[in-house]
Amino acid sequence: MYIQLLCFFLFLFLLLQATMSKRSFKKFVEQELGSLPHFLIYTVLEWSLIVFLFIDGVIAFLSNQFAKFFDLNIPCLLCTRIDHILVPRDPQFYYNESICDSHKKKVSSLAYCHVHKKLSEIKHMCEGCLLSFATEKDSDCDTYKSLIGILHKDLELLIDDERDLPLAFKKDDNLVQTTKNLVDYKTNNIKNDSLKQHCSCCGELLKIKSEKLPKNNNSFLAPAPSPRVSHNKLSENESEFKDMDVDRTPSFVRGGNKFFGIPLSDSAQNSPRWSVRSLKKSVLNKTENASDTTDPTGESILNQLKKEVRLDKKSLIDLYMELDEERSASAVAANEAMAMITRLQAEKAAVQMEALQYQRMMDEQAEYDQEALQSMSSELAKREEEMKELEAEFEVYREKYGCLTDQEDAREEFHKQNGNASAYDDCQETKPVSDLAVSSSNQQENGENIDQNGQSKRSEESTAENVVSADEEKGSESKEGIVKELSEITERLSTLQSNGDLLKHIADVLDVSEGEAILLQISQNLHMLRSFVAMPSESMNL
């Protein structure tokens, strides 16, 4: 324990000395302490570093196993380092100084496949995995050429223009030997099929570059291609392209989902139609080259095959571009479809909630209306009972006081007499004063009539009092109406009494005969009025 503390303090002392002298720790130890202390100190430091790395490796292994066991993402070796947070450094430090030379060589020979998400050896990758990064924005042909050059392809097949090599006509004697060479070449290709390599990323077979035919100074003559045969081949290829055009992905997926309004490609050259046109052009170039070679030899056939391979590679690049474009289009369309589905589900849930709310409100309104109907039906039943009670009371009063036909006849007679009285008053106004003197003889008779009228007035007042006493026996519900009618009747009686006093005064002033006639008429009118006033009180009692 003491030895460890002593070593630790010694290390701190040496470190402080090195920092103060502005020299590195290694140079400080070599210059100040010598070679033996330098060896011992660095041995201890290396062993301590080994221990730290062992602990770090064990922790990293446990973290990886923990992530695999619980199906978590395995942590990255470079992202999990915290020294780039604690000590800011250049990002190149982690790739140049933190990695040894052997691993740098291995990493530099690897390429990333965007399709399979793997790092694989670039020399054994197929073109599909190698060109998986090709997108609409990154469509540089030079990049493809360089990548194919890394794959040990022949760059001259992709860079050089089509050119016809000069062919020489030789004798027919060399034809047999060239055919033998072709047969040997085919047998060698058949043997090499068993030695084909697989892609280090996806595992597919790699297209190995074909070996060149053994050159021979002796050339041969080959028959010129028939124009009919080339024309038939061209028509077959065109029919194949038509089938490809029919089986192609629909334009709304490739050019953008018109329903969602998302453009997916801006250039017309990246479209599948352009690729099919390029394929057609390549086939036409093949047929033209085949027709132009009038004197082919073995080398000319190889050149034609190389040109075909070059055109096929170009068409493959276009097809890869089309495939990547359609993949991106399908991914965007799927994302938009999922977004629309989620939006429709949210709208559906909102509509369902609103419908439930309206249904609840309608149920509450229906309950409220039902309660109102029940209350109205109960009130109607009460009113019917009251009507029945009133009808029973009406029958009782009818049996007690009789019908009202006599009272109606009296009302009609009263109206007729009122009309006669008004006519009589008009006639009295037109009479001369001499006629009044003639009727003075009847003054005594009129006085007697006045006495009789007074007696009739008393009898009518007594009948009115009887009516009032009968009305007081009614219930509390009709008292207010009866009181009002009685007040009106008393007012009318007071006015009639005042009119009677006025008539008496007029009779005293006027002649006896005329006054008696007027008083008689007035007494009749008062009698009719009293009978008319008595009728509504009786009707109220009924």
Curated annotation (Swiss-Prot):
Gene of this entry: MYOB6
Among InterPro entries, the record links this protein to: GTD-bd (IPR007656), MYOB (IPR039306)
Q: What is the protein name stated in its UniProt record?
A: Probable myosin-binding protein 6
> Which cellular compartments is it found in?
Membrane
Keywords from the named record: Membrane, Signal, Transmembrane, Transmembrane helix
- GO MF annotations, alphabetized: myosin XI tail binding
Q: Which domain of life is it from?
A: Eukaryota
Functional description taken from the UniProt entry: Probable membrane-anchored myosin receptors.
| Record lineage | Eukaryota, Viridiplantae, Streptophyta, Embryophyta, Tracheophyta
Primary site of residence: membrane
Basic and acidic residues bias locations: 471-480
Membrane topology category: Single-pass membrane protein
> Residues annotated as region Disordered?
219-239, 419-480
A Gene Ontology cellular component where this protein is annotated is: membrane
Domain (GTD-binding) spans: 300-398
Signal sequence extent: 1-21
Q: Which residues cross the membrane?
A: 39-59
Q: Name the residue ranges with Polar residues bias.
A: 437-456
